[in-house]
């Protein structure tokens, strides 16, 4: 019965924040990977790099027949009013996938044929096992969003509160492999003109908040 867990993080700071200093370095290339033994299972923590392609490649490369769960920990931007700073992700949408007509994109579920009637574009995470976190929908795309006008438009159109560059691709890859997925993200910035500075200033603090919450979820998963 599969029992191991694959934890994906985009950045070294996000990966290092998960059980910091524990485990062994299994490899440094092409993706840094640390392995922790916990409750009779292996937890692989992989740094995938930025963007949807890197995220999906990491899932495809490191999820195997012994993988029970694909998880992502890390940071994000806030694009709509929502209380809290660390969130259990319930739905993930690729905001740059679809059909572009004029200056307007019609969003489709990533991988679907982008013509005709579109179904719900969101990938749905596994049920929250008891994280105690507020729930949110996140959108992912291969851009660092620092425009409040674009952020507000996407938030309204896709009924989303958060943005990052990877989770929806992790979700798509996990679903293709018939694996459950989950994600926890902590906010660094507000996807506006101050985002670059705010992200840098808040990265390590937010990464640790997300990682601490993911550590608790992984402990809960040990009881499955």
Where are these regions (language model features)?
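Mid-sequence, gly/pro-rich, charge-dense loop/helix-turn segments that line enzyme active sites
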Residues: 76-158
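Regulatory input/activation interfaces that engage signals or partners
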Residues: 179-181, 186-224
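A C-terminal functional module that forms or caps the active site or interfaces directly
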Residues: 143-196
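Active-site-proximal beta-strand elements of phosphoester/diester hydrolases
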Residues: 43-48, 137-140, 184
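Alpha-helix C-terminal capping segments
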Residues: 61-65, 79-82, 172-180
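N-terminal short beta-loop-beta anion/metal-coordinating cradle
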Residues: 2-60
